[in-house]
Every structure is written in C-alpha cells, then in structure tokens.
Amino acid sequence: MTSTIGLGMPTAPAAVLAPRRKTRQLMVGSVGVGSDHPVSVQSMTTTKTHDVNATLQQIAQLTASGCDIVRVACPRQEDADALATIAKKSQIPVIADIHFQPRYIFAAIDAGCAAVRVNPGNIKEFDGRVKEVAKAAGAAGIPIRIGVNAGSLDKRMLEKYGKATPEALVESALWEASLFEEHGFGDIKISVKHNDPVIMVEAYRQLAAQCDYPLHLGVTEAGPAFQGTIKSAVAFGALLSEGIGDTIRVSLSAPPVEEVKVGTQILQSLNLRPRKLEIVSCPSCGRAQVDVYTLANEVTAGLEGMEVPLRVAVMGCVVNGPGEAREADLGVASGNGKGQIFVKGQVIKTVPEHQIVETLIEEAMRIAEEMGEQAGSGEPVVTVS
C-alpha cells in the first residue's frame, strides 16, 4: 500500500503575538529595513579592519552563516583607509562603526559604506557636526544609525538622570535624531542598548511609542556565549513578540558566526524567519532508555548544513516520544534497545539502537532530496510504502 504525506513547515509563518510596529523604511545597501521588510540579522567583525584580507574572510564566513548586514570598527585612520575595498568586495552591506573621531564618518561615507553608525555619547562635539554629517549622508543616499549605549551615554543625560535609565537612553537618541531632522535628514535608525535586558526592553518600548524610526535591537556587552544568548533571547523575544524591532545583533563574547546562529534561531522561534532544519529532542530523565544527549548531538552533527525546512524529533522514552515523533516530519521514539522511526506520524520501520543515527540521517537526506525535487511544484511530499 502506498500513500503520500505532506512535509515541511508552513509556507507562510504564523503571525507574531502583536502586529509589527509601523516605521519609516530605509535601505542599507540592498537590505530593506523597517516594518515593510523582514527583521534582519547583523553581526560585527572582530578583525582589525585595516587587515583587509582577514576582515573580508570573516565577512564571507558571516555571509555563509546567514548574516544580512555586517558592521566593522573604524578606530584608526588605517581602518578608514581600508573601508572602500571592504565595502566594494563584501557580499553583504557594510556599516562603519564610528566612535570618538567625526572625520571617520565622512571617510566611511566617501568609501561607499552602506550606512554609518555614530555614537553621540563619545564623538567629539558631535552636535555641532550634525549638519555636515546630514548633508554628506543625504548626498550619498545612505542612512545613519544613532547608537546610544549605556556605557558611553552623553554626559548631559547622566547629569540629568544620574545613570543610564531607559528615559536617559531614549532622550539622548531622540535629541540627536531631532538635530538631523532640523537639517532635513530623516533616514535614521536608532538603538538604545543596555547590558541589563530589563532596562533595555523598557527603553525600546518607550522609544517605539515616541517615534517611527526603525529600531536596531541589542543587549550591549551581553557576555559569554551562554549568558549572552539567554539575555538576548529574553530581551529580543519580549520586544519582537510585541512587534518592536527591525534589525538585531546578538552581542556575544564568541566568534561572530555564533551571533548569527543565535539571532537566526531567535527569529525562527518567533516565526519571523522561515525555519530550516530543527532538531527537537527531549531533555532526558530517569525514564530515558537511550543516551539522548549523544543521540541528539550525533544526529545534529550528521545533518549540519541541511537547508530544508525539516523538523526532526529525537526522543528517549515511550512517554512523550511517540507523540513528539509523530508531530515532527521525521523522528525516533527509543526504548528497549530499539527505535521506531516515524515519518509525519507514520512508523516506517523499527531499527536496533545502534542504527538509529544512521537511519535518521539516511531518511532525512532522502526526504530533503524529494523536497528539493518537488520544490517547484507545490508542497513537498514523501511516498511511504
């Protein structure tokens, strides 16, 4: 007997908990930013920008990992001199990150960067240079991100509020935006970052209520990979589920590619980005009759790089195992030294425990191949005999 089974995630992601906040629209190079465009994932290179080859190599790695926009530091003249080559050869838009020296803003604009991030809290006499910056950026047709950080907040705000409160961050950002608007420049994106996700979330909520600028989300100095992932997921999840946020950067003390992986996973978890491969595995407990940790890790490693929207469930006992496996596109429910292999709710075979990983990988590859072949003719299906 032969039947056909539909596979794959929904073609259109489910709506988030709240409608997307309406914003003005910007173009950062080829990437649209604002409520009419998908939320984009950014990262920042960790190389010395003047080392052009190393920087371009890291940008290539970020591009391959799914990064949409990349930011590069520009603390020295030699870094500014390298921007033109980097901006020209990068496959994704390059944003120059400017602190302290206003002349590097103009160097970045002249170099053809897709946007410039300025920190009004530490650029010398920035308010007095806004007219020049607005004129140069407007002539080049590139946006400016006003990036306010708790750690480098304008001294005037610190004197007024005593510390980096949500109100202080928001007032600083909107003050600088108003100066640009006075000179006819409105292609502005704003960030108000803090290392405390609770303060950060409140700052963005206040900011979102007071303007229509696109917002770049970030928890600054979030920490090592584990801690930073948790902080960013909590903060971004809260805001994005409210429709707030147009670009994100997960700041981790880890390789930049890891930032992109986490950011992408956050968006996928909220159905703000089409899902690709998803491994569902149980946390294990005393009921487990198989080494779930090893099994899940081996399956994940074996399927790394798979681009199809496939949910694979790796379950360790008979309590939730069969149910979870049936809900997935492909799954295994393990117990008594063997595993039942499910494809979209139907058991297709039972294999010995030592063959589970190999069988899951083989079935996933087979399904992926069939999905690829049928991608142009509607929803993918798999034939089960």
From Swiss-Prot:
It catalyses: (2E)-4-hydroxy-3-methylbut-2-enyl diphosphate + oxidized [flavodoxin] + H2O + 2 H(+) = 2-C-methyl-D-erythritol 2,4-cyclic diphosphate + reduced [flavodoxin]. Pathway: Isoprenoid biosynthesis; isopentenyl diphosphate biosynthesis via DXP pathway; isopentenyl diphosphate from 1-deoxy-D-xylulose 5-phosphate: step 5/6. Signal peptide: none annotated. Keywords: 4Fe-4S, Iron, Iron-sulfur, Isoprene biosynthesis, Metal-binding, Oxidoreductase. Its cofactor is [4Fe-4S] cluster. One of its GO terms (biological process) is isopentenyl diphosphate biosynthetic process, methylerythritol 4-phosphate pathway. It comes from the Bacteria. Pfam families: GcpE (PF04551). [4Fe-4S] cluster binds at C282, C285, C317, E324. One of its GO terms (molecular function) is 4-hydroxy-3-methylbut-2-enyl-diphosphate synthase activity (flavodoxin). Binds 1 [4Fe-4S] cluster. Its EC number is 1.17.7.3. Belongs to the IspG family. PANTHER family: 4-HYDROXY-3-METHYLBUT-2-EN-1-YL DIPHOSPHATE SYNTHASE, 4-HYDROXY-3-METHYLBUT-2-EN-1-YL DIPHOSPHATE SYNTHASE (FERREDOXIN), CHLOROPLASTIC. NCBIfam families: ispG_gcpE, PRK00366.1. Converts 2C-methyl-D-erythritol 2,4-cyclodiphosphate (ME-2,4cPP) into 1-hydroxy-2-methyl-2-(E)-butenyl 4-diphosphate. This is 4-hydroxy-3-methylbut-2-en-1-yl diphosphate synthase (flavodoxin). It comes from Nocardia farcinica (strain IFM 10152).
